[in-house]
Structures are given as C-alpha cells and as structure tokens.
Swiss-Prot record:
Listed name of the protein: NADH-quinone oxidoreductase subunit K
Subcellular location: Cell inner membrane
Source organism of this protein record: Ralstonia nicotianae (strain ATCC BAA-1114 / GMI1000)
Transmembrane segments: 4-24, 30-50, 61-81
Superkingdom, taxonomy of origin: Bacteria
C-alpha cells in the first residue's frame, strides 16, 4: 500500500515539473496556462493525501473549491487568449506588451 510520503513526493515532482515548465517556456501562453493548471493539480493531490491520512474530509471539500476556481480560471484565460489571437494574430507572450483601450 502506498503511504503518505509516496503521494507527497509525487505531488512535489508534479509541482517541480510545472515550475520548470513555466521557467523554460515563457513564450507560449497555452503552455503557461497548462503549467499553472498542473501546479494546481499537484497542490490538490497533496490536499487529498493529507485529508485521507488525517481522516478529515475538509481537505477533499477544499479541493472541489480549488477545482471550480481552476476551471473558471482556465476558461477565462482561454477566452482572453482567443481574443488576443484574433486581434494580434499571435499567442507569443513577448508580443502582448501593448495596452490599448
């Protein structure tokens, strides 16, 4: 049976992969959004692992709230990305530095 340490190590590895993904790829907005979502999922896995280990359901309930916020964040982020691509014909982060009204 897997212990708490196994889940925490897996969560830490996923979190580290997402941080590396953010630092290595700062050009593409889609990859940045995917790395942020992976980071949130790693944190959620740690919440569920601690909740199961302690026998408390509060962590699992908190994960549902985090997942709903993450879904809204990704939907809004992708909607903004579609508008930016239609207006600027690029999803490169370096080209998104002008603020026009």
């Amino acid at each position: 049976m897997l212990s708490l340490a196994h889940y925490l190590v897996l969560g830490a590895v996923l979190f580290a992969i997402s941080i590396v993904g953010i630092f290595l790829n700062r050009k593409n907005v889609i990859v940045l959004l995917m790395a942020i979502e992976l980071m949130l999922l790693a944190v959620n896995m740690n919440f569920v692992a601690f909740s199961h280990y302690l026998g408390d359901l509060a962590g699992q309930v908190f994960v549902f709230f985090i997942l709903t916020v993450a879904a809204a964040e990704s939907a809004i982020g992708l909607a903004i990305l579609v508008v930016l691509f239609r207006n600027l014909d690029t999803i490169n982060v370096d080209d998104l530095d002008s603020l026009k009204g």
